[in-house]
């Protein structure tokens, strides 16, 4: 950055406002533009600053169980704050925040919650569900299928990113295209309001129609893609060799595609069931029958294609998996994809059985069309007009079967019957031999069908009069309702007959508040159940309270109605419903009952006072005047009524609570007091109100769990106006530090709020205060994408060479993240470009490790030393080699060609790293692909095509074609590796061909240790990381082998005795480390650098002790528990792990105790096995013959590997 550019930044920072976007972008790196949530997640993961925000977003709505009761406002406010509480409870990672890895995507959360509200609305509105049992069954299996698919998503993405085979790439991408369409369309409709949701489902070329085509075997359908992968003529999904990545990718795509296929079936069933219920609720029998048919047909079709006959998709996939599992070489498979599929085979078989044995809970029989409808002409006749019964109208009837929650389609409508003088006919229906109920529906003229009533299986006669009483009770004309109800009841109408949502005439009367009907007819009948509940557990008192029928509420209470009755699903009382609706008179009538329990809680712990807060202050005042009211009641989430008043920004309600002496400082389960919510929301109105009552509320109130103040929250949530309002207060305390020693200045810097930063500095915030990690504000600013923040801090005296706990300077922070502009600015201001971290890394090392090319170029242009070693004796170019970053390697060699000079230490180290990477590739190939017949030339070409030899080509020193020059050495190395491994497997016999006998014996004797290791611990060999241990044996063998074959020249001696010295039982520690990790799939702390939590340490110690016992038992031949107190072993291991001390010392002490051999004898044994002329060790008993073989696999010190450098580099440079 030139001085002119620096002046531009300084000038921009000096302005009162933040510089405009265009100016800022000139200073920021290209990669610092706006990123999607997924892009930001990937960046944070890549630089090891991932946080829990990303994983929580998708589940956030699930934490807001009280949405239907308390409302959308509370949900949208509390959800993101709950996320922050989770993040900060374990200590905020300030570096993660500085990189925007903790940014709370409020818009995304709001969108998710709005979708959730719409879903809830749809469910609450679903009063009648004819296919409810179908929905339950489908949803349960759908959730399982989707869980499996979601768990497989990451690896399926990996397949898409790494697939190279053109043959299967188009097929796999076809599966992915369908998957993306499926998920995108589902997401598009998920949160729509009910009417739009249905409209999208019914689109002629919409999602349902498109998904039905998934079964079509042609074109770009999912079915055609899966059939291509299953085609036995190609066998794409069956590996030919153990590392046939193409086949494993095809196999994984096949499995994933099958799960998607099943998911489509369940999604279609779920949506068509919803449509069937939608039409049922609307009384649209024609479309209900059509959707009923759709559900049955879809299930039958998909069931057949997935599990039918000998050609079911799932059967075919399982057959392929079983074929692969039976391959002779598959036990050595090193494919993560394959291992996962093996674990999921059982799940696929379970899914197959579920589908195959499932019968949809539908009644296939269709009732007969009604034909016997009689209008009485006796004393029971009911003259017209009454209700819908008017002379001249036509009435038709239809029937539907119902049994245990299962339904049939509607029957055909009967012939029309014309009403003439009489109403309410009697219907005759035959007894159902299958003992199912018959639901009777009626339709006047061409109007909407109505549910008329239920006939039990044994009933043959049904008088159509009960629905008319229910309709009369709902009549808005109360006088007419009384007259009609009187007549209908006299003629036999059943007051308790249930209709919509299982509501009776009593519920209907309560809804309308028709006291006259209730007094004159219903309540005089002592047998009437006034506690009768509808489908959701609402009694007539609930209905009246929610409708604000104050007089009817009083009438019911006077006649003994339970004033504290609770609904079945949410435990709401009538008082909850009345307060939520804001009906103050109804609330007062309820409160007058001597039996009222004013503090009853619903499912989420909210009392009527909580719900009242979300309505009006008059209702709140009525409750507060009750002597038993709990003003400080807390919900399950710890929210008080005052919390809700602040969240709802209702100052009148807040004032009422303050006047009633409510506690204003109670903290919820996330340790948030009301003032913390006000600050987090950025509510200036409520903040000013709370500040105005400082005698009751402290503006410096801290959370109990992490010591955050309101100012911390306002800054973290980027509520600048709220932060400024707090900073106006003379008594604001800027010295309070949160957990992790976080100041408000740290947070302001980490969230990039330059105006707040300036204000804090004006108010005297300590610019050099350090976080728990030792970061100053300048360290954090160096991580931010805005270089002007660093400018402000430095201009205010920030220490440019401040050190963190890891000895990082701000320059290190900027370089590691790749903040090129900030790096340049810091260097211009005198930052030490050669400063080292605790591990000896310079800024250049860190930039290289982070693959930040532009920053590396900047540092090199500013004079960074590219020959500076870190504590591991690595130069920056070595980091690039380890990363396989070819462009970075070339950049360094352009700057200094001597870096590949084999006569220099740095050149030899580079070549050693390259050789080790190549040897690892070869070892993995041969150890896993012994069934393949590729010759050296073909293998060389494969390595070349895969780019595995590019580094070797780059480091070739001679003129001419690097590939052709390096090729002979690679071919010899391949041949050598192949030969030694062949001899290893044979375990005996003399070498043939051009290899001389002594050298081949060395090869065999050296590799025999690895074979012993394999036989003794076979489980380890199956795991990926076991390759590292045998690789060391190969490297030693190669070094001893090459001189005798005259492959290279060297001044050093490579005899076995030069490699072995001071061997004792500690030599087994590396083996034990690998052994333990492979059995537990965990990496243990054998070096004692950090402590481990108690439960983790306990579990780990038990596993280590168990495997250690197995190892010692194998060596001795008798149970180790008979010789050693294993409980004591486990206890000592646990103490070591928990305290962070080396486990190695514990293991070693017991190994010494267990062994009868002293250190000298162990050394003799090891040398014997490596010697070309074995001698007899008389002191060794037969019981210990296995031990040296185990020890020799790991006993050599890692530093001795450095002696391989000379030979390895000569291989590539000759």
UniProtKB/Swiss-Prot annotation:
Start and end residues of each stretch annotated as Helix H8 is the probable transmembrane region of the tetrameric pore inserted in the target cell membrane: 250-269
UniProt key word Ribosomal protein: no
Protein name: Delta-latroinsectotoxin-Lt1a
ANK repeats: 464-497, 501-532, 536-565, 570-600, 604-633, 637-666, 670-699, 706-734, 740-769, 773-802, 806-835, 839-868, 872-901, 906-936, 966-994
Keywords from the named record: ANK repeat, Cleavage on pair of basic residues, Exocytosis, Membrane, Neurotoxin, Presynaptic neurotoxin, Repeat, Secreted, Signal, Target cell membrane, Target membrane, Toxin, Transmembrane
Domain notes per entry: Two helices (H2 and H8) are predicted to insert into membranes and form pores by assembling into tetramers. The helices are contained within a helical bundle domain that undergoes significant conformational changes during pore formation to allow exposure of the transmembrane helices and transition of the toxin from a soluble monomer to a transmembrane tetramer.
Organism name: Latrodectus tredecimguttatus (Mediterranean black widow spider)
Domain of life: Eukaryota
Chief place of localization: secreted
Cited SUPFAM superfamilies: Ankyrin repeat (SSF48403)
